[in-house]
Curated annotation (Swiss-Prot):
PROSITE patterns, A to Z: ATP_CONE (PS51161)
GO biological process, one term: negative regulation of DNA-templated transcription
Taxonomic placement: Bacteria, Bacillati, Bacillota, Bacilli, Lactobacillales
Organism: Lactobacillus johnsonii (strain CNCM I-12250 / La1 / NCC 533)
Homology family: Belongs to the NrdR family.
Listed name of the protein: Transcriptional repressor NrdR
Keywords linked to the UniProt accession: ATP-binding, DNA-binding, Metal-binding, Nucleotide-binding, Repressor, Transcription, Transcription regulation, Zinc, Zinc-finger
UniProt-listed Pfam families: ATP-cone, Zn_ribbon_NrdR
Stretch list, region Disordered: 1-22
Amino acid sequence: MECPNCHKNASRVIDSRPSDENRAIRRRRECENCGFRFTTFERVERSPLLVVKNDGTREAFNRDKILHGVMMAAQKRPISSEQLDALVDHVENEIRKQGLNEISSKDIGNLVMKELANLDDVAYIRFASIYRQFKDVSGFMEAMEDMMAKHDKE
């Protein structure tokens, strides 16, 4: 590993430990040339994932977009940022488990709605109203009836 101080390619690992909930390894290194100590992180490189938008365009998967959407839906609700992060992690893991290179924005939205329905009814309705693009009250009513039917089954 190249030293950020002297740019020589001679360093040794002096400490390694798990980081980021075991999704990375943090390594403390020391340059054998100048003695400078620095930290590196090793992570699994995930294959690129493309999202196919409704208009057919493709863009790189961005978990922050999902997080922003669920944060907007969960405003002023008793939902912690940790719960929202876990929800987005679960959605991303479900997507990656499928082993696809592309996924439609519709499929992502359906996964998010499924997770939100289990977390908070109001956040689910808020997200659904944007995602499904309700044109009138009947769209809201249909989503409410779906939610009420789910509760009746429980």
